[in-house]
Amino acid sequence: MSIFSSRRQFLKSLGLAAGAAAAGNALPGKAVEIPAGDHLWKSASPAAPRPSGSTYMGGFKAPRLGRIRLAFIGVGGRGFSHLAQMCVMDGVEIVGICDLKEELTKRGVDRVLSRMGKSPLGYSGGDMEYLTMLKELKPDAVIISTDWSSHARIACDSMKHGAHAFVEVPLAVSLEELWSLVDTSEATRKHCMMMENVNYGRDELMFLNMVRQGVIGDLLHGEAAYIHCLVTQLGDTRGEGAWRPEYHTRINGNLYPTHGLGPVAQYMNLERGEDRFCRVAAFASPALGRNAYAKKHLPADHRWNNTPFICGDMNTAVVKTQLGRTILVQLDETSPRPYSRANLIQGTEGTLAGFPTRVAGEKLGNGNYHEWIEGREKLAAIYEKYDHPLWKRIGELATKMGGHGGMDFVMLSRIVECLRNGEPMDQNVYEGASWSSLLPLTARSIAQGGMPVEFPDFTRGDWKTTMPLAVVS
């Protein structure tokens, strides 16, 4: 079939599309459908038993794929970056690209043709056009880089059409959506992996390796954050600025928990045999910074000068695990301060921390844990001894390829390796659901005055049988 059709051109005007990329392409001024209030957490009750015929997906090994027929849904900034990196992967054939905007679909098609010598089919139009692509091409796997509100719907549809789903962060917004992803993955026996790229950063991989080797003893406490001033998005009409600020007007909670939480959760083996998330209590500061920015930098009649923001500028939550460990999780996308994900893990014999990278412990350096080992020269010996085998193997190439310092390339390489070798994914659907659930759970806790709220057990008790993530080479 032709890349574009008159029907697709007509559909282009009908609504917010599957192609609104994580850094990409929602329609300017088009409202995003955002669940709010108790709609975020209405499926927080204990899970029903797993339906007959469904499969627990922790450690699941799908049949090997000698060649991966891959499709993309959403190729704005984030999706196009994934597309460009997948063009150099062995064993990958990019068969389809879908985006709301015809020009972005064409850009993706042209990139694949120039790099791989074969043109994928392009789809563009309304927000359900991706279904046409799934039905016609039947891809093995799909990479989804759309606005948050469409993640769950598109991923579930992809799995129902026989494709493994790889989804940008967060996996979904509401507990109901997260349960639908878990249930669909189990029913279809298809991987549903949230692509938490930060877990593949050099420091995060090294800390995982050090924790697995027992360098800091028994784990006690972690700290995770997403501190990133994004207020300038209020002046944007394309990309994330077209839809992401809307969440700050609808939800008072941690809107973006997984970048900081994902690595800490895997250090602690949460939902993987050793420990699990139990409850969280959250609090929010006043929401002042965005209205102040809009008043200072935008016209008086601009929508953001006539819309109240409710998401506190700083969101602080404390997570308690079944073993009694604690995790501090913070979000601030508004205040003028340097970027940080915290990335701290503390044990009985030492502490590893990020931003800046620094370590201290009884088994590190000369054992003087009253001072940090930090700075390029002092950390050189730590990297030499503890760099993760995966980073040693492909870190140099990943750094050259770019993508958040190489973490994107390492993540995509592992996805390809796992699919081609029939290995379990490094991040299973239950981890993606648990990490993403901080969004609705912190909103619920804040709405209830900071009362602790329980985490759903997305594994239905089977986390106890799931192996910890190995230090793969």
Swiss-Prot record:
InterPro entries: Gfo/Idh/MocA-like_OxRdtase_N, Gfo/Idh/MocA_oxidrdct_glycsds, Glyco_hydro_109_C, NAD(P)-bd_dom_sf, TAT_signal, TAT_signal_bac_arc. Predicted to be exported by the Tat system. The position of the signal peptide cleavage has not been experimentally proven. Binds 1 NAD(+) per subunit. The NAD(+) cannot dissociate. It holds the Pfam family Glyco_hydro_109_C. Residues 1-31 form the signal peptide. NAD(+) binds at G77, R78, D99, W148, S149, S150, H151, E168, V169, N197, Y256. Its cofactor is NAD(+). Keywords: Glycosidase, Hydrolase, NAD, Signal. Substrate binds at Y226, R244, Y256, P257, T258, H259, Y339. GO terms for molecular function: hydrolase activity, acting on glycosyl bonds; nucleotide binding. Its EC number is 3.2.1.-. It comes from the Bacteria. It is an enzyme of class 3 (hydrolase). The keyword Hydrolase applies. PANTHER family: BCDNA.GH03377, GLYCOSYL HYDROLASE FAMILY 109 PROTEIN. Belongs to the Gfo/Idh/MocA family. Glycosyl hydrolase 109 subfamily. Glycosidase. This is Glycosyl hydrolase family 109 protein 2.
